[in-house]
């Protein structure tokens, strides 16, 4: 077992342990001994784990209800969120009760936002069942849904009281979801995580999955170190958006047919290519990045136009009027924040 403590406004632990899902009540009882519980999941994850988690919670004395919505990024919208919160109200859940987000990034984002806003906030636990959620979105307290204008534009910061990651749940993931998670993992390699790039080069995770628990722990620790310094993204936390400025544009323009980790991988390459043009990154580093991305079966190019990507960037959360904060890789394994105008941003895609 690996336990990583995050000293945020609500301090909590991230527990990474094989088989932890079967003992979920051992972790929740000390935190919430007497309350009602709502488990939020989606149509992909619920058939695998909902019944067993619900039975374990009920056996431990909890009264449990559940809410399952259609899987996919297209469900992460205001209408689905309101339906969830209306259901919570219909169940007469109180501020003393608990929400469990059982699923990948979409489940965690939407369920977390429901927890942040229902009755002005109730406790919630993240139980990530996808690689992407395990290494990134379940940690740090960002919650949101998408709007027509762009991705994650309606949200709140709300830290969970626990993140419980059972790597055994990754065994039921389709191949695409493993690849999807690798996009975010490679991102961490460019945020000064010692040895991560070398490990991924020598033993690509997509082919050496036995090392996944250690990789998850390294990514979570890296994110914890940043979140503890900048919980609400007023400074260095923006580094975690490497690949996301262009990546979110690709997702939106594709109507979310391009999955998040895939889009982040392409976004990293596009920004790195722009950095080479601007003399901020050498060509060798760019080629090594491309090779690493390809080694994890991720794409490095897109057919989506520059205009569509830049249009989405105007709605990016890091945009402030005429300027936008971007994350630029400046060496192999290191990235820096930079404020540019939207006109200057366009030159990174020329």
Say what each PLM segment does.
Residues 1-97:
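ATP/NTP phosphate-donor binding region
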Residues 15, 113-203:
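A glycine/threonine-rich phosphate-anchoring loop and its flanking beta-alpha core
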Residues 106-113, 134-135, 249:
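Short glycine/serine/threonine-rich phosphate/pyrophosphate-binding segments
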Residues 183-185, 280-350:
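C-terminal charged capping/lid subdomain of soluble metabolic enzymes
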Residues 199-307:
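Active-site segments that bind and position negatively charged phosphate/pyrophosphate groups
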């Amino acid at each position: 077992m690996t336990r990583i403590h995050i000293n945020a406004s609500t301090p909590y632990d991230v527990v990474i342990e094989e088989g932890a899902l079967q003992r979920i009540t051992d972790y929740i009882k000390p935190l919430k001994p007497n309350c009602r519980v709502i488990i939020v999941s989606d149509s992909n994850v619920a058939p695998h784990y909902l019944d067993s988690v619900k039975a374990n919670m009920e056996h431990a004395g909890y009264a449990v209800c559940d809410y399952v919505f259609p899987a996919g990024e297209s469900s992460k919208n205001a209408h689905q969120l309101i339906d969830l919160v209306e259901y919570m109200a219909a169940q007469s859940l109180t501020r003393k009760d608990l929400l469990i987000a059982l699923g990948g990034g979409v489940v965690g984002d939407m369920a977390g936002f429901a927890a942040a806003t229902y009755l002005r906030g109730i406790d919630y636990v993240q139980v990530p069942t996808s690689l992407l959620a395990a290494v990134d979105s379940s940690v740090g307290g960002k919650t949101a849904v998408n709007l027509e204008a762009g991705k994650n534009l309606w949200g709140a910061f709300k830290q969970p009281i626990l993140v419980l990651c059972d790597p055994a749940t990754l065994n039921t993931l389709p191949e695409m979801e493993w690849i999807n998670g690798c996009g975010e993992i490679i991102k961490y390699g460019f945020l000064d995580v010692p040895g991560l790039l070398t490990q991924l080069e020598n033993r690509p995770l997509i082919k050496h999955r036995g090392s996944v628990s250690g990789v998850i722990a390294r990514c979570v620790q890296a994110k914890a170190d940043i979140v503890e310094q900048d919980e609400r993204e007023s400074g260095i936390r923006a580094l975690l958006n490497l690949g996301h400025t262009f990546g979110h544009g690709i997702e939106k323009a594709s109507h979310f047919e391009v999955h998040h980790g895939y889009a982040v991988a392409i976004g990293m390459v596009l920004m790195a290519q722009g950095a080479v043009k601007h003399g901020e990154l050498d060509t060798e580093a760019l080629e090594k990045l491309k090779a690493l991305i390809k080694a994890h079966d991720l794409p490095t190019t897109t057919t989506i136009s520059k205009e569509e990507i830049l249009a989405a960037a105007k709605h990016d959360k890091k945009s402030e009027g005429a300027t936008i904060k971007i994350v630029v890789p400046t060496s192999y394994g290191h990235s820096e924040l930079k404020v540019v105008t939207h006109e200057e941003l366009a030159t990174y895609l020329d």
